[in-house]
């Protein structure tokens, strides 16, 4: 971006776990927190060259996500002491808006941050989680 001299735009996709700790996920939470901090550092370093850097933080994306594959779904259900078919409703109910998060929601957030609609935004975190209070930006 710098060599081209025309600015640029980077959007990281991190996770709610970059802001909120979870049991048995220390490595994942730490990696996502580092990703968020890297984005903020790069926003500082790139601003003079008009390079914007922002972060999208999804939580519990209900389709096309690891949440619904392999043994992970069963492990999550067991951790919450429920059946696997109750898990989607659990994720919906724990959000403030009581709504599910889908891949399209994440794509729209990325599009927004990559577009001119957010031309004056850099170093920001956009949580796409239907209002998970655990991940309120602090």
Task: Give residue ranges: language-model regions.
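Alpha-helical segment proximal to the catalytic Tyr-Lys
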Residues: 3, 44-45, 119
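Residue(s) in the substrate-gating loop at a strand-loop-helix junction
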Residues: 15
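Active-site loop immediately N-terminal to the catalytic Tyr-X3-Lys motif
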Residues: 20-26, 48, 98, 116
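Active-site helix of classical SDR
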Residues: 31, 39
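Short, small/polar-rich loop/turn modules that mediate ligand/substrate recognition or access, typified
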Residues: 47, 52, 121-123
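A glycine/serine/threonine-rich, flexible loop-to-helix segment
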Residues: 48, 61-94, 137-138
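A conserved structural motif in NAD(P)-dependent oxidoreductases
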Residues: 82-84, 95-106
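Short C-terminal tail/terminal secondary-structure segment
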Residues: 110-111, 122-138
